[in-house]
Amino acid sequence: MAKKVRELELPAIVDETDGTVIYEGFPDDVSGITTATERWAIRKQAKVGNVWTTSWANGNQKKINAWDDRATLTYSIIPLFSNYQG
């Protein structure tokens, strides 16, 4: 089963592309994996105007992506509380 990002977990790697997009990588385990290994959860923060949005690769926090693929993955905003009923 793929692990998910833990609350208050800090990213192991950060890529600030151009001042409007920041990628943060959360590895399954920092020992023995590379940036090409599909064991990363990737968070994307994007700024449009004065508003920042936070989204996750494949719309979840599971550690199933390769950090090297961060620019080509599909990102979705996920609810802060997964059991939120609205």
Segments predicted by a language model, with ranges:
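Intrinsically disordered, compositionally biased low-complexity regions
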Residues: 1-86
